């Protein structure tokens, strides 16, 4: 293991490690009042350095949001440290991802931010704590057996494309901020309906449920722990899996496979079923897209002939 320690840039603390052993990916978040975020940042940095944790942690006066990788035998030590050190995080949920065939992160970044989630809400009367009803994975699974609800996917369009629950409503968007702007208008005819929301780990649908409550919706619930918690619950109990395809993840793995269902098509030929996201080989472009094996042979991991030709001219 090689370690490049320690740099400090304004509101960031970060370092990088070259791992040779596999790690586990976990995420956790909580909306809560945090007063001394500078102190929190330093304490988190020291424990992460000690436990060789990589990933990203955002902290603000409204809470904490983390997505990290850690060696399996060190997870419990991290949990104990967080719950003992920060009394407002004693009940925080840790989501454990299942697929770590590829290392998710190359460095750790702990950053102070104005908000732990970029939602773009500027209404001063909005209360993020006034959320909809939290559903356990068991309750959520039971509700899916019924037909008296509207199921809303609170993830971006490119996430929905490769995996989602059957009959889930997609709010077409590239960002969560954009999605919130569309949400209320798209669901305005369902105010009397039971609305169930889900996302990857829970933070987006929790915030979205509060925004809906703020806008007069009364029957709003969300999946606590998100798809990650649901998938773990279903696998543990050997129940039929109702999430189809892959979970898009915001790290170097890009996705976790849940079922063998392929829900999308190659973005280039638009014919071949495919759900493998890659980034354009031209780093100046770096577009995220789905490319089948046939288009890969002709375009070689580029999103277009233009990027291919540009790359060749520079190399």
UniProtKB/Swiss-Prot annotation:
Q: Which SMART domains match?
A: RHOD
Name the source's superkingdom. Answer: Bacteria
Question: What Gene3D superfamilies does the record tag this protein with?
Answer: 3.30.70.100, Rhodanese-like domain
One of its GO biological process terms is: tRNA modification
Q: Does the keyword field hold Repressor?
A: no
Q: Which reaction does it catalyse?
A: uridine(34) in tRNA + AH2 + O2 = 5-hydroxyuridine(34) in tRNA + A + H2O
Q: Which residues form the active site?
A: 199
Q: Where is the Rhodanese domain positioned along the sequence?
A: 145-235
Query: What Gene Ontology molecular-function terms does this entry list?
Result: oxidoreductase activity, acting on paired donors, with incorporation or reduction of molecular oxygen
Q: Which UniProt keywords apply?
A: Oxidoreductase, tRNA processing
Which InterPro entries did the record assign? Answer: Rhodanese-like_dom (IPR001763), Rhodanese-like_dom_sf (IPR036873), Rhodanese_C (IPR022111), TrhO (IPR020936), TRHO_N (IPR040503)
E.C. designation(s): 1.14.-.-
The record's similarity note reads:
Belongs to the TrhO family.
The protein's matches in PANTHER family, at most eight in alphabetical order, are given as:
TRNA URIDINE(34) HYDROXYLASE, UPF0176 PROTEIN YCEA
Q: Function of this protein?
A: Catalyzes oxygen-dependent 5-hydroxyuridine (ho5U) modification at position 34 in tRNAs.
User: What NCBIfam families does this protein map onto?
Assistant: PRK00142.1-1 (NF001133)
Name of protein = tRNA uridine(34) hydroxylase
Name of the coding gene: trhO
């Amino acid at each position: 293991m090689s370690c490049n320690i320690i740099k400090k840039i304004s509101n960031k603390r970060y370092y990088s490690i070259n791992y040779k052993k596999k790690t586990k990916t976990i995420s956790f978040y909580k909306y809560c009042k945090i007063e001394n975020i500078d102190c929190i940042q330093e304490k988190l940095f020291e424990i992460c350095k000690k436990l060789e944790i990589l990933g990203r942690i955002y902290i603000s006066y409204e809470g904490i949001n983390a997505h990290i990788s850690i060696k399996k035998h060190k997870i419990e030590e991290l949990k104990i440290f967080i719950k003992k050190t920060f009394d407002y995080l004693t009940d925080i949920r840790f989501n454990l991802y299942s697929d770590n065939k590829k290392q998710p992160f190359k460095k750790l970044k702990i950053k102070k931010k104005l908000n732990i989630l970029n939602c773009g809400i500027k209404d001063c009367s909005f209360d993020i704590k006034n959320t909809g009803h939290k559903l356990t994975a068991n309750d959520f699974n039971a509700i899916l057996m019924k037909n008296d609800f509207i199921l809303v996917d609170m993830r971006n369009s490119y996430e929905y494309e490769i995996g989602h629950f059957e009959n889930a409503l997609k709010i077409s968007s590239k960002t969560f901020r954009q999605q919130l702007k569309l949400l209320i208008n798209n669901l305005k005819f369902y105010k009397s309906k039971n609305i169930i929301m889900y996302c990857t780990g829970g933070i987006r649908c929790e915030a979205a449920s509060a925004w809906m409550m703020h806008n007069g919706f009364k029957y709003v619930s969300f999946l606590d722990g998100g798809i990650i918690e649901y998938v773990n619950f279903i696998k543990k109990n050997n129940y039929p899996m109702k999430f189809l395809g892959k979970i898009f993840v915001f790290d170097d793995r890009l996705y976790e496979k849940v079922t063998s269902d392929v829900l999308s098509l190659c973005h280039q030929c638009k014919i071949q079923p495919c759900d493998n996201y890659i980034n354009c080989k031209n780093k100046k472009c770096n577009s995220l897209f789905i490319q089948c094996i046939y288009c890969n042979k002709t375009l070689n991991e580029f999103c277009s002939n233009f990027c291919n030709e540009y790359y060749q001219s520079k190399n």
